[in-house]
Amino acid sequence: MSATQSAEPVVVKETPRVRGLPLVGSLFGMARDPGAFFVHCYRTYGPVCRLRILGREYVLISGVEAANFMGTRAGKDCLRSKEFWQGLVNEFGASRMLTGEDGDSHKELRDIMRNGYSKESIKGRYNELVAITDGSLARDWPVGKAVPVVEAMQYMVVDQLGTILTGVAPLDYVKDIRTATLYILNVLVTRQRPRILLKRPQYRKARSRVMDLGRQMIRDAKARYATTRPEDRNLIDDIMAAHIETPAKMPASDLIVSLTGPYIAGLDTVANTTAAVVYCVLKHPEVKARVQKEVDELFAGGDLDEEGLLRKLPALNGAIMETMRLYPIAVAQLRAASKDFVFEGHRIREGEMLYVGTSVPHFMEEYWPGAGTFDIDRYQKPRAEHLQPGVYSPYGRGPHTCLGKSLAEVQMALSMARVFHKLDLELESPGYVLETKTAPTPGPSMRFKVRVKGYRHAAASS
């Protein structure tokens, strides 16, 4: 990895250009499978290349070189996020949001939300999370039916986050959040669809509903503020406290985008990942047997002991980590060059838009022997293949690494543990190969279904 400011005397290479079609450029490769497309670019052109999508030019930096660069001071100084997220900020009438800020402004927002997005925010509530999950399974996973897994997981995520954060799960808004997120990410963030799509009634209705949800969350959070002790605050309470106590940091204009953020962030990411875990575990009977044995032992004693939860679930945790390697949500990170710099011998100009392909090493045999094989033991010592520098980036890299990482790890582990403990599931056919989608984030297709054969353990008990 190397990066220097352009003022330094360096030998600059000519950056190769990715071959694409007239007008659309590399759109179809990106739309079909962005992860595979970025790997192809790395293998063909190296860690730096240029490509066009719908008339816009981007620089793609990828591989371990790019992943490691993101964590350096040079990466922090040379790249910023604002351009890609400003359209979303404007759409909500806000002044700023966490994902679109850098430097001190970004740190200020992370400090406000850090506790609420950490696993400490649900300490002492694991059994409550289990009960919420059981309710979701009883409601959305009927015995004898083929269940659309991504949709069922989306309802579970909103049920969990809503109940834990506000005491109320806004399940009536799931489809609106999903629709609004799809349009906003495709049109305003990744810019792979024309802006005129935002005039569609389907989007306008969904956006209006999400705004209504945000306004209701504001009213509820204001009502709780006077009666909630600082040590008892959750994420929503912390955001409202910042608004009331330091309005310059959290003005009223930013409340809706900040308060609905957990739903928008978690709906696709956690739901896509857990849906992919269901597929991977069911696809590999030997993994399924290990996971079931493990989770049955976890719940055999009744209420959970929260201490060292993930250490008690090496097979399930390995399955989740391996799923996140093969089906990453953060295929690439979107950035703009904040100054002229040279990366791996290639000049990148201030203001140029970049894709940072941090997931490319996930699929490289050099780092993961048998990279295409689902192997849940890669993460245990002495192998620990994920600890090689720059090879594993399921939550992104750099200053914008997912703030909710530790919370998501617990949420996904408990959700999957309960699913495989409670339900007897099967793929629609043994030979089924997962169909995937790329928008708004990569993951299993909404058409992916599993059949609920029955309950492994009685619905009314653990």
Feature roles, as predicted:
Residues K13-L23, Y126, R229-D237, C280-I329, ...:
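Cytochrome P450 I-helix active-site segment
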Residues V64-G75:
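Short active-site loop/helix that positions an aromatic residue
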Residues P22, S26-G29, S118, R207-T274, ...:
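Conserved cytochrome P450 catalytic core segment spanning the I/J/K helices
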Residues S26-G46, D212, Q216, G302-E344:
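Conserved cytochrome P450 K-helix E-x-x-R motif and the immediately C-terminal K′/meander segment
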Residues T15-V39, E57, E65, E83-A169, ...:
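Cytochrome P450 catalytic-domain helical core, especially the substrate-recognition surface
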Residues V356-R383:
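Conserved cytochrome P450 K-helix/beta-meander segment immediately N-terminal to the heme-binding cysteine loop
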Residues S2-Q5, Y42, T133, I177-A180, ...:
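Cytochrome P450 proximal C-terminal region
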Residues T269-K288, Q292, S406-H421:
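Cytochrome P450 catalytic-core helices
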